[in-house]
């Protein structure tokens, strides 16, 4: 599978018609974008605001941050399962706007978790997003729309806006292109023998924080509560197959789109290791299911990917520690070394 990520640097963002990118400046026709968002009858009105670094602005009730991206080619391939047709993500060309993001706010959420982004002062200096220009989207639900339905509408509004902005750069020169290509059928005999094969175990969900007992959709627009350990191509993660849930408690979508561990394993591929592939898994509340998950994850790492070692990450704290430790232990019993654990916290 081969993914070509075409990055375009955005130096300024302002309202203007038509929506376009000219000389690294992004112009957005807010009236047109509002019409795109309000096609969803679950949203009554929406407020769009540009927040630039240094402005005395604090964005509150933040539930996700999304990088503007779109597939280059036929429309309908973006964020499959959410916007696009259900297909495997991770191949072809994807356009990406750098230095700008879509920020989703949901002031109507009754959940305990949301975030804020400061555009000035100490908060901006400490934030990953203090130096990024943002399009803040603040929707209002239509009468009679339930809380969970509105959450899905908010997510869709953000994804639509991300694609809308990225498509505006269709005629703009690309600043740099990154190619992510990995043949998962390659085995040790096909690669330099001196290099260890390293897999990645990505725990992407835990049920302990399910709101109202209902899991959020995060994989191809679907929830993963009962998901058994599954092989995915790392390009799927980078290309919109995985999104954040309906709060910022998980990794935000922007971070997943630029997953630092996946990109680092790619960077080191065929230099000091062979990137063997990715196994995704979930945490469980049931002890027997935990053992089952760990056993199956270790089998995929060992037998399907023929990995010599595995890097593991978890989601949230508390219970997921146990699940991750069991996966690491099962990998060790299979003769595969858990190289490290990286804790991606909210």
Can you annotate each of these PLM segments?
Residues 284-300:
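A general structural motif
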Residues 185-186, 191-284:
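Small-residue-enriched flexible segments
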Residues 204-206, 313-322, 344-346:
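Gly/Ser/Thr-rich loops at beta-strand to alpha-helix junctions
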């Amino acid at each position: 599978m081969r993914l070509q990520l075409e990055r375009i640097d955005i130096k300024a963002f302002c309202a203007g018609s038509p929506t376009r990118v000219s000389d690294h400046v992004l112009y957005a026709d807010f009236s047109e974008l509002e019409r795109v968002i309000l096609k969803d009858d679950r949203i009554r009105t929406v407020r769009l605001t540009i927040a630039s670094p240094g402005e005395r602005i604090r964005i509150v009730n933040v539930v996700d941050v999304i990088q503007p991206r779109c597939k280059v080619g036929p429309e309908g391939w973006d964020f499959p399962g959410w916007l696009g047709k259900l297909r495997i993500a991770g191949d072809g060309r994807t356009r990406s706007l750098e230095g700008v993001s879509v920020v989703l706010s949901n002031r109507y959420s009754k959940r305990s978790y949301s975030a804020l982004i400061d555009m000035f002062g100490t908060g901006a200096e400490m934030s990953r997003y203090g130096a990024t220009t943002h399009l803040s989207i603040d929707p209002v639900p239509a009468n009679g729309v339930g809380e969970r339905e509105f959450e899905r509408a908010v997510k869709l509004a953000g994804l639509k806006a991300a694609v809308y902005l990225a498509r505006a750069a269709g005629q703009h020169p690309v600043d740099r292109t990154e190619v992510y290509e990995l043949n998962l059928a390659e085995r040790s005999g096909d690669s330099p023998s001196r290099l260890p094969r390293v897999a990645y175990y990505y725990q992407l969900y835990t049920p302990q924080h399910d709101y109202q007992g209902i899991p959020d959709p995060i994989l191809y627009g679907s929830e993963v509560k009962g998901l058994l350990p599954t092989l995915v191509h790392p390009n799927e993660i980078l290309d919109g197959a995985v999104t954040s849930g309906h709060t910022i408690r998980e990794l935000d979508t922007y971070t997943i789109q630029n997953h630092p561990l996946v990109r680092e394993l790619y960077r080191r591929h065929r230099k000091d290791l062979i990137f063997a592939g990715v196994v995704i898994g979930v945490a469980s509340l049931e002890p027997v299911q935990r053992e089952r998950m760990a056993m199956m994850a270790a089998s995929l790492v060992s037998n399907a990917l023929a990995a010599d070692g595995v890097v593991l990450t978890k989601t949230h704290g508390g219970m997921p520690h146990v699940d991750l430790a069991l996966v690491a232990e099962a990998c060790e019993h299979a003769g595969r070394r858990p190289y490290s654990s990286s804790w991606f916290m909210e």
